[in-house]
Swiss-Prot record:
The keyword Secreted applies. It comes from Legionella pneumophila subsp. pneumophila (strain Philadelphia 1 / ATCC 33152 / DSM 7513). GO terms for cellular component: extracellular region. Disruption phenotype: Deletion of the gene has no effect on bacterial replication in the amoeba A.castellani. This is NAD(+)--arginine ADP-ribosyltransferase Lart1.
Length: 303
């Protein structure tokens, strides 16, 4: 057993979203306009072609996100087996987490999927150590690439050409992105927990990605970055595209970005660093963890 927590039974407190459910957690306040995620391997992930479609995601996809999952994320230190995508309200925290590298995130478009860690602990009559309180942390299972405003690499800010600003009042866009988000989480959960048929996976990925491109076409209008060529994007966003072209691999650089993406869809999971090496031994491994009941660093909170 990798968790000592009691089994969770579905009840009326569960609020369902496609792809993931939430129970007894507190979502991000609507007043927060930006979150920040630090990652010391940011440059190895953020400029990859697959990341344009999958965004930034974790390696743990519970069907129900509740206080037990938040505990495992926050107070488990030995592996990434239970970690979600961490974000902070404080850019300095993200700067420290990422050793100078972080992304600035617009949480509005996927706020239904973001959990306020500290408010959730308080709601469940739990306290965090002071050193954790300072982190002002929020978590999600994934961050859509369209919600990333900019990328900071050692004091240099790069605008994200694929950022799509969605106002709070644009309920149609938020609902469509929610549907896409749920589809992505379901795809990732299946990838991480089941041995999948490669052909079926490719079809599902292609279906999701084309719907994602259609989402841009519907809500970007004439500013849709996927309707531009690499040359056009390089002229508008030279630093981002320079990193993108160095990091990504595709057979042809001609045509519109959406055509380049569609031609690369069969390799999305094959080329992503997180998913390319997943096999049966990984799926059925025994997860390693030090929980809050065993970790001397965290245990005093519960004594």
């Amino acid at each position: 057993m990798y968790s000592k927590y009691p089994a969770f039974f579905l009840n009326k407190n569960i609020k369902s979203s496609s792809g993931v459910q939430f129970s007894n957690v507190v979502k991000i306040p609507s007043a927060i306009e930006s979150l920040y995620r630090g990652d010391n391997n940011l440059t190895g992930i953020i400029f990859l072609l697959p990341t344009l479609i999958t965004g930034v995601f974790c390696q743990n996809f519970p069907e129900v996100v509740d206080i037990e999952q938040i505990r495992l994320h926050k107070l488990t230190n030995l592996s990434n087996d239970f970690h979600m995508v961490s974000m902070s309200e404080d850019p300095q925290i993200a700067l420290d987490w990422g050793n100078g590298c972080f992304i600035t995130i617009d949480p509005v478009s996927f706020s239904d999927y973001i959990v306020d860690v500290h408010a959730t602990f308080s709601e469940n009559q739990l306290n965090l150590p002071g050193r954790m309180e300072r982190e002002k942390e929020h978590v999600a299972l994934a961050v859509p690439f369209c919600s990333i405003k900019k990328i900071t690499i050692h004091n240099k800010e790069l605008a994200n050409p694929f950022y799509l600003s969605i106002p709070q009042e644009n309920h149609e866009a938020k609902m469509e992105l929610n549907t896409l988000y749920g589809e992505l989480i379901s795809l990732l959960r299946k990838k991480y927990t089941q041995e999948v048929d490669e052909k079926e996976e490719q079809i599902a990925l292609r279906t999701y990605a084309i719907r994602y491109l259609d989402f841009y076409a519907k809500f970007c209008g004439c500013d849709n970055p996927f309707d531009k060529t690499i040359a056009q994007l390089s002229e508008l966003y030279p630093e981002f595209m320079s990193n993108f072209l160095q990091s990504s691999h595709f057979s042809s650089k001609t045509g519109l970005m959406k055509e380049i993406v569609v031609n690369s869809l069969d390799n999305l999971f094959k080329e992503h660093p997180y998913t390319k090496s997943i096999d049966a031994s990984y799926i059925y491994r025994v997860k390693e963890s030090t929980t809050c009941y065993e970790d001397d660093w965290a245990k005093p909170v519960y004594d």
